[in-house]
Amino acid sequence: MSIGILGKKLGMSQLFDDKGNSVPVTLIEAGPCRVTQLKTTALDGYTAVQIGYGLSKEKHLSKPEKGHLLKSGEELLKHLKEYRVEETSSYEIGKQITVKNFEVGQKVDISGKSMGRGFAGYQKRHGFSRGPMSHGSKNHRAPGSTGAGTTPGRIYPGKRMAGRYGGKQITTKGLLVLKIDDQKNLLVVKGSVPGKPGSIINIKPNNVVGKKGGEKS
């Protein structure tokens, strides 16, 4: 399995296809990343490739972190991510990982932290229907029943209620790569990806087996 790449979400735009239809796209600054460690079954119990992305200041790193990063290059990196692989023979410490690892028409899975919306109610967070808005109603945006009475005498875990909305790690699968600019390290994918502009995201090849992900028929 091929490894992925770390990048930064730049924002959204649009492209026009051959028929003149507007296609929403997301612009991603993907890499360049550096291989910082190769993990083997003998030493670590599993096989993986660790990469780093984004520059960091020395004062923000501990001595062990600094020593670990300097083994693969002179620049100190801020974000680390590892990918499980069957073998590491095709990788070496210090090797650059760029958008050239991807190709137009390929499908990718993108993970990131969704935009936080703070404390939200039932309608906004879960899409509940509101109550009557007419005169005399006291149930405009109330949740309704949250469970039974004496038995079970509690609210079951997982009950959809008001609370913090967003700000979680999520993955959007099967996004189509429409354009690649290796000079500017740009990756253009169809649709939206998690996070706000400037947030760090993880892009890896789509590995759904036996399913047609991303595109709707």
From Swiss-Prot:
Record keywords, A-Z: Ribonucleoprotein, Ribosomal protein, RNA-binding, rRNA-binding
GO molecular-function annotation terms?
rRNA binding; structural constituent of ribosome
Q: What does this protein do?
A: One of the primary rRNA binding proteins, it binds directly near the 3'-end of the 23S rRNA, where it nucleates assembly of the 50S subunit.
The record's annotation in Pfam families points to: Ribosomal_L3
Enumerate the Gene Ontology biological process terms.
Answer: translation
Annotated InterPro entries: Ribosomal_uL3, Ribosomal_uL3_bac/org-type, Ribosomal_uL3_CS, Transl_B-barrel_sf
Provide ranges: composition bias, Low complexity: 142-153
Q: Which family does it belong to?
A: Belongs to the universal ribosomal protein uL3 family.
Q: What is this protein called?
A: Large ribosomal subunit protein uL3
One GO CC term on file: cytosolic large ribosomal subunit
**Keyword Ribonucleoprotein tagged:** yes
Q: Does the keyword Ribonucleoprotein apply?
A: yes
Quaternary structure per UniProt?
Part of the 50S ribosomal subunit. Forms a cluster with proteins L14 and L19.
Q: Which domain of life is it from?
A: Bacteria
Write out the ranges of the annotated region (Disordered). Answer: 127-162
Say which species the protein is native to: Prochlorococcus marinus (strain AS9601)
